[in-house]
Amino acid sequence: MKLALKDFQDAAVAVLVRRLRQAAGEAKDGDLQSVALSAPTGSGKTVMAAAAIEALLQGDDRHAPDPEATFLWITDQPDLNEQTRRKMLQASSALKSSNVVVIDSSFDQETFSPGSLYFLNTQKLGKEKQLVTPGDSRTFTFWETVTNTVNARPGSFYVFIDEAHRGMAESARNQKEATTIIQKFIKGSDGEISKVPLIAGISATPERFNTLIEGAGRITRPVDVSPEEVRSSGLLKETVTFFHPTENQPSDITMLRAAAQSWQDFSGRWKDYCREEDELPVHPILVVQVRDASGKQISKTNIAEAIRAIEEEAGPLDNDAFAHALQEGARLEVGDRELRYLAPADIQGDPAVRVVFFKAALNTGWDCPRAEVMMSFRPAKDGTLIAQLVGRMVRTPLARRVDSDERLNTVSLYLPHYDEAGLKKVVDTLTSKDPNVLPPADIEKGEDMVPFVVPLAVTMRLPLWRSCRPTQCRGRERRAR
């Protein structure tokens, strides 16, 4: 591996590889098998899966390489596949662009190639889609490719189902369609595909994958990672602070200005820390969640006014410092400025971006440790989506905690349309012990704050970063530093 794994990840990978090899031996003899890796949000499930794939391909001190090993990775959205593909290429020395393939509508092979990892999103397999429709221009349908591969090497064909990132922002109809397609791999489908002998599930909780394979007659081999292991590893921020109005309701732009001040504070602190510790620079990102469209307007939020407010606090920014994830592939005219589009998978690796406008596109599978401050213009009814976004934002930029500046172990969220009751819904979701959102956290409340802190921060007696009204924020942050 190109990346050093945390101790808990190393241990989980060892168990995962052992379970996969055991399942492969049984699958070769015709038994239906499943292996379930369950680990909370932020634990590095993709990196652990990449390490397991590498071990199967390259072998180890006790096991020879499996030159026949073939992997199919399934999600229900193309941007998730792209982000996962990039992570795996960055993490693994065994996976290269030559043996990592994204399946598109032109794919046409008798079997999958040994030693390769294929990425597929279920949208390619809907009714009348080219991949599954026989015709003069196609030699093999996708279902025939799967069946032929199973018949050729049943103990060396691993189908990974990424359940961890599904369902956050999808309609019920889309979720049902994706589940139906995935069930074909698990239970087979008359006239299309036989049951795939070896299924590996990647999920935040065992229940999610177990529900998917219920009634399939498979032997399931679990691999579980506890929330406590993730919290103590330094992979996640320790404190999330919510800023919300308590009296004399400030305007949206006032709250945005406060968020921009906080973002600038993070930027300065990271610059100082990276210089002192000789680290590569960390450039924090301010993410701004705007409201839905109104008539011909792309959003009810005045994005041009928001940009002016941010620049009045932070100073002039290059055009490339701003981006949006509102319309796929389209540049957006905002006043006298043109905002470029960035797919969620591209945000973390873009060296120039500093501010990103979005609606809900960042919720599903998005991973951006640089996102340190969020401002949401959306109403309180979107509390669950806000909570899910928090779960995507709490990754630490350096994959470890910062000991010399506690502020860098925090995330700040500004929610001007959330009163105490609306904010309580967000906090309740975050503390619901649902690993799909975030490892469990504790709540502490002050006079006009609602921070929540993971138990590790409490036991270490780390300071809480108090939420405040926008007019108080600038002074408090200076004193805190």
Question: Which ranges hold each PLM region?
Answer:
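Walker A/P-loop
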Residues: 27-52
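Interdomain helical connector at the RecA1-RecA2 junction of SF1/SF2 helicase-like NTPases
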Residues: 6, 191-202, 209-308
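Conserved RecA-like P-loop NTPase helicase motor core
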Residues: 331-429
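N-terminal pre-P-loop "Q-motif" helix
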Residues: 3-31, 121
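Long, hydrophobic alpha-helical segments
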Residues: 395-481
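Conserved RecA-like ASCE ATPase "motif II neighborhood" in helicase/translocase motors
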Residues: 102-108, 113-160, 168-188, 338-346, ...
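Conserved Walker A/P-loop ATP-binding site and its immediately adjacent core
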Residues: 47-51, 64-93, 121-124
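Conserved C-terminal RecA-like helicase domain
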Residues: 43, 75, 100-101, 110-116, ...
